[in-house]
């Protein structure tokens, strides 16, 4: 009798442990998907509950991929280059392009300019609110003197049906602010601790070899997807600390 009770208890504990591991694996996989989705598809589909998002302008964003020698670190001028977001969201751009002032010109689907802002290195643009369901495009021309035809470009799509049918990042999030950041892999522990100390959580990460590398030495950059619930100014102040300390700053 006692043996049966012990056996049943052991079985229940085993089931609970397996279920917990499965849930944890699913959550981790979903988080990994956000970072890999950006890196592989230049796209991110946000959870519906996010109210603020900061797009990263990465270091060397102004370098053209058509030049003889690759100078970019990541395969897109904005991270993510294509954003699918819920309505009633505020979006801004943070520039990590060392030594350069970037410019963002935003147009609606009628090609009318609705936002135009210059952004100094290690600073954030004014925030713009998006409510209407449509696709907006943004760009910067004349960013590279060696390739005058090169244009930095990205899109923001609000409330697209794709968000309803293909939101593999989860339909809800406990974070009101989400963002992206790129840091050297060798220093990931240092930056992880700084983020955690300031209540900025890592929701996903993807290690990759930057485009300047010849393919040896392994993944030397890490793309982070971040979430927080504090004030956006507090989150950006953490970004500024990290960006100012990066080896290419």
Regions found by a protein language model. Give the residues of each.
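Short amphipathic alpha-helices in soluble, non-transmembrane regions
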Residues: 194-198, 235-243
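Short amphipathic alpha-helix segments
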Residues: 186-206
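Conserved short beta-strand edge segments in small beta-sheet-based binding/regulatory domains
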Residues: 203-206, 240-249
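Short, surface-exposed ligand-recognition loops at beta-strand->loop->(often short) alpha-helix junctions
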Residues: 177-190, 228
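Beta-strand cores of secreted/periplasmic/IMS beta-sandwich domains, seen most often
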Residues: 80-100, 104-105, 125-132
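N-terminal edge beta-strand
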Residues: 48-88
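Secretory targeting signatures
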Residues: 1-30
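Extracellular/periplasmic metallocenter environments
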Residues: 27-30, 35, 42-64, 119-167
């Amino acid at each position: 009798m006692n043996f049966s009770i012990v056996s049943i208890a052991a079985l229940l504990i085993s089931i609970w442990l397996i279920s917990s591991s499965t849930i944890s694996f699913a959550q981790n996989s979903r988080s990994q998907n956000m970072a890999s989705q950006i890196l592989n598809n230049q796209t991110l589909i946000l959870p519906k509950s996010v109210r603020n998002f900061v797009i990263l302008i990465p270091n060397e964003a102004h370098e053209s991929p058509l030049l003889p020698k690759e100078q970019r670190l990541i395969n897109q001028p904005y991270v993510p280059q294509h954003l699918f977001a819920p309505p009633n969201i505020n979006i801004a751009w943070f520039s990590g392009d060392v030594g350069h002032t970037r410019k963002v010109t935003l147009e609606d689907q009628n090609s009318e300019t609705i936002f135009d802002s210059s952004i100094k290195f290690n600073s954030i643009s004014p925030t713009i609110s998006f409510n209407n369901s449509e696709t907006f495009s943004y760009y910067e021309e004349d960013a590279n003197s060696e390739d005058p035809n090169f244009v930095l470009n990205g899109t923001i799509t609000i409330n697209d049906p794709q968000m309803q049918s293909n939101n593999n990042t989860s339909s809800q999030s406990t974070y009101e602010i989400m963002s992206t950041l790129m840091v050297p892999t060798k220093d990931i522990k240092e930056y992880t601790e700084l983020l955690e100390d300031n209540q900025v959580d890592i929701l996903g990460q993807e290690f990759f070899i930057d485009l300047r590398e010849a393919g040896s030495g392994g993944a030397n950059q890490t793309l982070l997807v971040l979430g927080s619930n504090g004030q956006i100014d507090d989150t950006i102040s953490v970004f500024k600390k990290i960006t100012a300390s990066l080896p290419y700053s």
